[in-house]
Amino acid sequence: MNCVRVLRVTSLLTFGVFAAYAQPGAERAAAQTEPILVYNAQHASLTQAWVNGFTRDTGIKVTVRNGSDAELGNQLVQEGSLSPADVFLTENSPAMTLVDAAGLFAPVNPDTLTQVREGFRPSDGRWVGIAARTTVFAYNKNRLTPAQLPKSLLDLADPAWKRRWGASPTGADFQAIASALLEIKGEAATAAWLKAMKQNAVAFRGNVAAMKGVNSGEIEGAVIYQYYYFGDQARTGENSNNTALHYFKNRDPGAFVSVSGGGVLASSKRAAQAQTFLKWVTGKGGQDILRTGDSYEYAVGIGAQSNPKLVPLADLQAPDVNPSKLNSKKVIALMMEAGLL
């Protein structure tokens, strides 16, 4: 009887020891089988196409939480190391810079970084470009001739353009454009331009609304990204048939190409799977979706081709802007001073 008791106690103790050692491994295994969580500020349809392709190719499941650049970037900063997110995807790079400055990103795997063209990834390697879009001046073909178009984004500060053009100043897209202006021309020139914009521009709630304003003739032109036009043309064209695109080129601030970014959170419990996701998005599978899909954003992978309807990246003559230098906080402060926010 005593032997039985000893055996039972020994067995329980042995089980307890094994359980104690097995628990961390069990937790890791559970974390590896759970879906990775992506905080997504990119267009939901594009990210869903990436998620579908990634899960099909790897078997790794993904949960997506959608929001805006500013909303999710600030949420990550507030959550800090307690964030449940594994990956952050944005439309524009200032939100990536915000999270990076808070020290919340893990280094991106080198074999992912080397898939992406130089200039579409920051030098610190803590996030990487996943797509890009270019600034354009969408104009009403019935109200402006090519000879009447502004030669530079800066020309729109001229009183001659008063109430003739528009933009969506509250959106992350325009704030990224203003951030590029700040990086290229400096604070004084940017502040002056934004104050002139307050006097001259018609403010819209969103880039689609601004393009509709151009198409209807409410305004003659608007500063937007190119994919709004191409997306509408691919559908019905009802919001863009009277519209054409003017590319500023010549390294002008109005030729700014904005980088959409992706990064893995340092606090991720599924870091390996998160890194695999980022590698897939920047690799052939993810970049081919940009070429064949209906997002009309530019591919940034080395050797990757963009949608053939787009003006090639090499022909845009974009200014050289380090995506990690775009200062969203300073731009928002300048826009508030100008009365735009």
Which role fits each region the language model picked out?
Residues 50, 189-193, 260, 269-281, ...:
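Short amphipathic alpha-helical coupling segments at ligand-binding clamshell hinges
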Residues 94-98, 221-242:
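A ligand-binding cleft/hinge motif common to bilobed small-molecule-binding domains
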Residues 188, 295-341:
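An extracytoplasmic/periplasmic, membrane-proximal ligand-sensing/linker region
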Residues 1-35:
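Short, low-complexity disordered leader/linker segments with a strong preference
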Residues 41-48, 67-71, 77, 84-219, ...:
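Extracytoplasmic ligand-binding site segments that recognize negatively charged/polar headgroups
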Residues 23-87:
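Conserved N-terminal structural module of periplasmic/extracytoplasmic solute-binding proteins
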Residues 161-168, 280-304:
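Periplasmic-binding protein-like
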Residues 136-143, 182, 257-270, 289:
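A bilobed periplasmic-binding-protein/Venus flytrap-type ligand-binding module shared by bacterial periplasmic
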